From Swiss-Prot:
Lineage: Eukaryota, Viridiplantae, Streptophyta, Embryophyta, Tracheophyta
Gene3D superfamilies in the cross-refs: Histone, subunit A
Stated role: Variant histone H3 which replaces conventional H3 in a wide range of nucleosomes in active genes. Constitutes the predominant form of histone H3 in non-dividing cells and is incorporated into chromatin independently of DNA synthesis. Deposited at sites of nucleosomal displacement throughout transcribed genes, suggesting that it represents an epigenetic imprint of transcriptionally active chromatin. Nucleosomes wrap and compact DNA into chromatin, limiting DNA accessibility to the cellular machineries which require DNA as a template.
Protein known as: Histone H3.3a
GO molecular function: DNA binding; protein heterodimerization activity; structural constituent of chromatin
Subcellular location: Nucleus; Chromosome
Protein family membership: Belongs to the histone H3 family.
Top-level taxon of the source organism: Eukaryota
Tissue: Pollen specific.
Keywords: Acetylation, Chromosome, DNA-binding, Methylation, Nucleosome core, Nucleus, Phosphoprotein
N6-acetyllysine modification, residue list: 10, 15, 19, 24
Organism whose genome encodes this protein: Lilium longiflorum
Renumbered residue ranges of the record's region Disordered: 1-43
Post-translational modification: Acetylation is generally linked to gene activation. Can be acetylated to form H3K9ac, H3K14ac, H3K18ac and H3K23ac. H3K9ac could compete with H3K9me and prevent gene silencing. H3K9ac is restricted to euchromatin.
Phosphothreonine modifications at: 12
Length: 136
C-alpha cells in the first residue's frame, strides 16, 4: 500500500490534555545520571516453583552433613556420653531423616490444599502427624 501524507484535522471533542504534576515534570526534565539499570526481579512464586522442580529432580542430601552430624551427637549425648559414630551410620540417619521430612511435607501440603490454601501452616503438620498416628 502506498504511503500518503497525513493532513492536520480539526479536533472534534475528546479529552483535553491533563496538566503534569510538578514531580512528574521534574523527573522528566532531570537527566539520568550514570544510567543505573534496575536489577531484574522475577514475579513472586516463580523462583519458588523453579526450586521445587530442581529439588524434586535431585536425589542428593539437602541438609549439610556437618550440622546434621553435630545435631546427632548432641541428641545422642542425652542418652549416653562418649558415643562414637561410623560415618556410614550418620549418613544412614541423615537419609532416613530427610526421607521422613519429605514425606511429612508432602502430607502437610495435601492438608493445606484440602483447607483451600497454598501456604502450609503448623496446624497442617499437626494434622498430618495425627492422621499418620504419630501424635495423639
Amino acid at each position: 500500500m502506498a504511503r500518503t501524507k497525513q493532513t492536520a484535522r480539526k479536533s472534534t471533542g475528546g479529552k483535553a490534555p491533563r496538566k503534569q504534576l510538578a514531580t512528574k515534570a521534574a523527573r522528566k526534565s532531570a537527566p539520568t545520571t550514570g544510567g543505573v539499570k534496575k536489577p531484574h526481579r522475577y514475579r513472586p512464586g516463580t523462583v519458588a516453583l523453579r526450586e521445587i522442580r530442581k529439588y524434586q529432580k535431585s536425589t542428593d542430601l539437602l541438609i549439610r552433613k556437618l550440622p546434621f552430624q553435630r545435631l546427632v551427637r548432641e541428641i545422642a549425648q542425652d542418652y549416653k556420653a562418649d558415643l562414637r559414630f561410623q560415618s556410614h551410620a550418620v549418613l544412614a540417619l541423615q537419609e532416613a531423616a530427610e526421607a521422613y521430612l519429605v514425606g511429612l511435607f508432602e502430607d502437610t501440603n495435601l492438608c493445606a490444599i484440602h483447607a483451600k490454601r497454598v501456604t502450609i501452616m503448623p496446624k497442617d503438620i499437626q494434622l498430618a502427624r495425627r492422621i499418620r498416628g504419630e501424635r495423639a
